[in-house]
Amino acid sequence: MNCLKNCRSYQTKRPLWLYNTSLRFFFNTPMLADVIFKIQGSTVPAHRAVLVARCKVMAAMFNGNYLEASSVLVPVYGVSKETFLSFLEYLYTDSCCPASILQAMSLLICAEMYQVSRLQHICELYIITQLQSMPSRELATTSLSVVGLLKKAKFHNSDCLSTWLLHFIATNYLIFSQKPDFQDLSAEERSFVEMHRWPSNIYLKQLAEYRKYVHSRKCRCIVM
């Protein structure tokens, strides 16, 4: 009984943060942090144990013969602070909620940089889902460059996304062929799009002939 009382007494004196078992509680907080990332003039605290467990690149970086292994302050290049925070949030929480297609692409690039393939796939799925849900009118007027997304996806080895985007451009040929960035497609990409375009030239030709036929039937004078 005395042991139980002492245990309860100890629990009432413990700080509340010790009861929180979610890693989200430690995300972007200096509490128990043992590494600080310096990015775009700002600092972001983190915990090596979490990073090593969740990211192979960081595991090699902090355990190998690299400067980062013995440094508390680690600089980060080639990525914005917002994107890097989203990347760290995924490592801590195993969840990802991009605010836009462009943010998802930036996060995908960061995931490719640190070789976190699952996060890459999540970003790919987000981009595909968002583009699929866009009405044709919005696709025609948006300033978002789908061809630009295709180029980035190819450059960063996102084969699934780049293949889907190429089919998406071909399927919506009449919309994307009118955009200036359509000319940025490579010869190989243009050949693929022309071969798989919809509507196809054959379909458009048949449609024009049918409309011509219908118009001629309406205009014919029929004497009863």
Where in the sequence are the language-model features?
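Charged, flexible boundary elements
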Residues: 12-30
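Canonical BTB/POZ domain core
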Residues: 31-135, 139
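Ankyrin repeat (ANK) tandem arrays and their immediately adjacent linkers/low-complexity segments
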Residues: 1-4
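BTB/POZ-protein C-terminal extensions
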Residues: 24, 30-35, 74, 129-224
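A conditional alpha-helix N-cap/helix-loop micro-motif detector
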Residues: 16, 100-101, 143
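Exposed alpha-helical structural elements
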Residues: 18-22, 57, 86, 202
